[in-house]
Amino acid sequence: MNRLFGKSKPKVPPSTLTDCISNVDSRSESIDKKISRLDAELVKYKDQMKKMREGPSKNMVKQKALRVLKQKRMYEQQRDNLNQQSFNMEQTNYAIQSLKDTKTTVDAMKVGAKEMKKAYKQVKIDQIEDLQDQLEDMMENANEIQEALSRSYGTPEIDEDDLEAELDALGDELLLDDDTSYLDEAASAPAIPEGVPNDSKNKDGVLVDEFGLPQIPAT
């Protein structure tokens, strides 16, 4: 069948704006190179004309320089046109890419909105409120347990004012306890005489009572 009707040629994909921009920029660079060569020729003819006297030879060189200059102007015009085309295509390409980016962003936002709707459907406000109530009840129970465990047994309530008054009085008592002057007074007091008043001794030096009988020492 291919021999009778021939084989169909593969379809060539259409060129994109990026390909067109690259092609135009390449042509513009090629023209720039041609302009550079023409500039070099103009410099050469200019130097020749400076060294030549007026006459047919100089006029001939001048005509060559004018032709080169005319070509240069034409190339410059072509280059400017290509640069403008490239700029316009770049602006168009930028606008297209911006629209694509915008569409991608909108599509992503739509997907996000759908996901959020699904997530909201799975979340029940009533369940959240019930859970909060349960947590609150458990915290209250925990506090009651802690209060029960820390309860004191048989400890009377103490007034803070009474404690402060006792503390102030305790300070005065401590100051009195620290005073040791009573010890000095006791040391300087006269000694207690031994024996009983009006006691006397016999000739042997033994204490006798008022009847002259020896006294029995206290045990």
From Swiss-Prot:
Principal subcellular localisation of the protein: cytoplasm
Subunit structure: Probable peripherally associated component of the endosomal sorting required for transport complex III (ESCRT-III).
Subcellular location: Cytoplasm, Cytosol; Endosome membrane
InterPro entries per the UniProt record, alphabetical: Snf7_fam
Protein name, entry field: Charged multivesicular body protein 5
GO biological-process terms attached to the record: protein transport; vacuolar transport
Comp. bias intervals (Basic residues): 1-10
Topology class, membrane: Peripheral membrane protein
Coiled-coil residue spans: 28-153
Entry's Gene Ontology cellular component terms: cytosol; endosome membrane
Organism: Xenopus tropicalis
Domain of life per record: Eukaryota
Short name of any one Pfam family annotated for the protein: Snf7
UniProt KW keywords: Coiled coil, Cytoplasm, Endosome, Membrane, Protein transport, Transport
Family affiliation: Belongs to the SNF7 family.
Annotated region (Disordered), positions in chain: 1-20
Transport recorded as keyword: yes
Function summary: Probable peripherally associated component of the endosomal sorting required for transport complex III (ESCRT-III) which is involved in multivesicular bodies (MVBs) formation and sorting of endosomal cargo proteins into MVBs. MVBs contain intraluminal vesicles (ILVs) that are generated by invagination and scission from the limiting membrane of the endosome and mostly are delivered to lysosomes enabling degradation of membrane proteins, such as stimulated growth factor receptors, lysosomal enzymes and lipids.
